[in-house]
A protein has these predicted regions:
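Extended, solvent-exposed, turn-rich assembly/linker loops in the middle of proteins
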Residues: 113-177
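Sequence/fold signature of self-assembling virion shell proteins
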Residues: 166-269
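Structural beta-strand/beta-sheet cores of well-ordered domains, especially the beta-sheet scaffolds
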Residues: 63, 140-142, 179, 240
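Alpha-helical scaffold segments that mediate packing/assembly in large oligomeric complexes
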Residues: 62-140
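Assembly/oligomerization interface modules of large self-assembling protein complexes
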Residues: 1-65
Length: 269
């Protein structure tokens, strides 16, 4: 630091700032008095959820769908060609949205778990003990999210111990579960070249102070919540163009809403 006057100046400026008081979790402190006698003047306070609250900017996924007017005019039976192509386009955008909500460096869940909510496997493969520790880090865990190969690796560990996990009923469908918490497969969770991956556990919903999805409703030409289809006109080649856009993000309302089991070994393919 002695060799860099600019760095020394910036550090001195930072240390001289009047930073807001925080508790040991880094949350904005609430001023209070306790154990006093007589009639002292009580402190006043504003309740700030965080000393420096984060602002989320909605991400966007977009594409331009091109449909030749001849196709729309002549081949609309028995299926509406425009509607079918829009359906496929929307599905592709939703798939990309899911990938971004997991892997985006800014707001993706894999990159936004608190360091205290990240744990490593005990021996490599995902064992029942690992899943129990991941589960114990939060209240009201709603779901696990894991790569299909990670689920298979976990079941192998259960079988080797003579354990047979039950299933959970979700909207009339039976899905794998552990301790009554459903395990949903997700192929968008990355697998490294060393055949390792991660397993997520989360509490969801605004009322539960969990993980929530963010989107904007009331868009012009809205087709679904947070997704719009805007007609851009017809080109000189008689090709109709539609701008398909979806806006989204994700937020972890409190640190213990999301946990990640890291370095999960999948074994041999």
């Amino acid at each position: 630091m002695d060799s860099s006057p600019d760095l020394r100046t910036r550090i001195a400026e930072f240390l001289s700032q009047d930073l807001p008081a925080t508790n040991k979790q880094g949350e904005a402190a609430i001023a209070m008095a306790a154990g006093h006698e007589g009639e002292p003047e009580l402190p006043g306070t504003y309740v700030d959820y965080e000393a420096g609250p984060r602002e989320y900017e909605l991400a966007v996924a977009q594409t331009i769908l091109r449909v030749h007017t001849r196709v729309a005019d002549l081949y609309n039976g028995p299926m509406d060609q425009l509607e079918q192509q829009l359906r496929l386009t929307v599905e592709a955008l939703r798939e990309r949205q899911e990938w971004e909500m997991l892997n985006n460096r800014d707001f993706g869940l894999l990159h936004n778990a608190d360091s205290r909510q990240r744990i490593h496997t005990r021996s490599g493969p995902p064992t029942p003990n690992d899943m129990d520790e991941l589960l114990s880090r939060r209240r009201n865990t709603r779901l696990f999210l894991a790569h299909p190969r990670a689920i298979a690796a976990f079941f192998r560990e259960c079988n080797s111990r003579g354990l047979y996990p039950a299933s959970a009923d979700v909207d009339g469908h039976h899905v794998p579960a552990w301790r009554g918490v459903p395990i949903f497969p997700c192929g968008k969770i990355p697998v490294t070249d060393q055949a390792t991956t991660s397993i997520l556990a989360m509490r969801t919903g605004l009322e539960e102070q969990g993980v929530i999805a963010l989107h904007q409703t009331g868009l012009p030409d809205e087709r679904e919540p947070g997704l719009s289809v805007r007609f851009m006109g017809v080109s000189d080649q008689a090709i109709a163009r539609y701008l398909v856009s979806t806006y989204f993000s994700a937020a972890v309302l409190v640190p213990d809403a999301l946990g990640v089991l890291e370095n999960v070994e999948l074994g041999h393919a």
